[in-house]
Amino acid sequence: MTPEYVMGLFHSAMKVTLMLASPLLLSALVSGLIISILQAATQVNEQTLSFIPKIISILVVITLLGPWMLGVMLDYMHNLFYNIPSIIIR
């Protein structure tokens, strides 16, 4: 197994991780930003108020994009397991 091959595996793993995590993180960021703007406009300083909308937005994103996320993860794992013999030989 060459260092280039290991770096390629690491690169593809990071790419899949970013693809799967970014929709969840972006939805939490947007909902938190909206709630923070509303809190600043109404001068409500409750720290725990933003958690429920974030949880709801993440659950909505998982519900909508869950099949796509599962497909991406399964494709990556299938390719990884399929290439195990070539990894061992190198």
UniProtKB/Swiss-Prot annotation:
Family to which the UniProt record says this protein belongs: Belongs to the FliQ/MopD/SpaQ family.
Locations listed in the record: Cell membrane; Bacterial flagellum basal body
Signal sequence bounds: none
Pfam families in alphabetical order: Bac_export_3 (PF01313)
Protein name stated in the entry: Flagellar biosynthetic protein FliQ
Broad class of where this protein is predominantly found: membrane
Organism: Buchnera aphidicola subsp. Schizaphis graminum (strain Sg)
One GO process term, biological-process aspect: bacterial-type flagellum assembly
Transmembrane segments: 18-38, 55-75
Topology of this chain in the membrane: Multi-pass membrane protein
Gene label: fliQ
Cellular-component GO terms for this entry: bacterial-type flagellum basal body; plasma membrane
InterPro entries according to UniProt: Bac_export_3, FliQ
Function: Role in flagellar biosynthesis.
Keyword Transmembrane in annotation: yes
Keywords (A to Z) from UniProt: Bacterial flagellum, Cell membrane, Membrane, Transmembrane, Transmembrane helix
Key word Ribosomal protein present: no
